[in-house]
């Protein structure tokens, strides 16, 4: 079971949700990755907290450009993740 979300993680997840609901529909689908960068960010923040989750999200967003092939890289397993990978 994952630890409870910090206030910082909650704020960042709320900002990502605003982006998903208000801005992303206007831009159209263009993410090179599955899951999308915003979904990846939410999962990273939930698994790792505000510092490492933000770092993983920024690294992912910086890779989202025409010269990168994209792909399906999942969020790494977190310290409380008990699922088999």
Curated annotation (Swiss-Prot):
SMART domains listed in its UniProt record: Haemolytic (SM01234)
UniProt subcellular location: Cell inner membrane
Membrane topology: Peripheral membrane protein
Keyword Cell inner membrane: yes
UniProt-listed Pfam families: YidD
GO CC terms of this entry: plasma membrane
Protein name per Swiss-Prot or TrEMBL: Putative membrane protein insertion efficiency factor
Organism whose genome encodes this protein: Shigella flexneri
Gene designation: yidD
């Amino acid at each position: 079971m994952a630890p409870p979300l910090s206030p910082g993680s909650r704020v960042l997840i709320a900002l990502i949700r605003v982006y998903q609901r208000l801005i992303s529909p206007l831009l159209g689908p263009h993410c090179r990755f599955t899951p999308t960068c915003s979904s990846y960010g939410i999962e990273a923040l939930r698994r790792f907290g505000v510092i490492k989750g933000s770092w993983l999200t920024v690294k992912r967003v910086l890779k989202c450009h025409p010269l990168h092939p994209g792909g399906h890289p999942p969020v790494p397993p977190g310290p409380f993740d008990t699922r088999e990978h």
